[in-house]
Amino acid sequence: FLAKNVAKKLVSHVAKKQLE
């Protein structure tokens, strides 16, 4: 189950958006 990987990617994506 890749839910953890997906969650990590989502968090990383959101974090990047917040940094801009």
Curated annotation (Swiss-Prot):
> What family is it from?
Belongs to the cationic peptide 04 (cupiennin) family. 04 subfamily.
**Where does the source fall among the domains of life?**
Eukaryota
PTM sites of type Glutamic acid 1-amide: E20
| Keyword set, alphabetical order | Amidation, Secreted, Toxin
Q: What is this protein called?
A: Short cationic peptide-4d
Pfam families (alphabetical): Cu
GO terms assigned for molecular function: toxin activity
Asked whether the keyword Secreted is assigned, the reply is yes
Protein's cellular compartments: Secreted
GO CC annotations?
Answer: extracellular region
Q: What is the lineage of its organism?
A: Eukaryota, Metazoa, Ecdysozoa, Arthropoda, Chelicerata
Quote the InterPro entries the UniProt record gives: Cupiennin (IPR035164)
Give the species: Cupiennius salei
The record's account of tissue expression is: Expressed by the venom gland.
What's a BP term from Gene Ontology annotated to this protein? defense response to bacterium
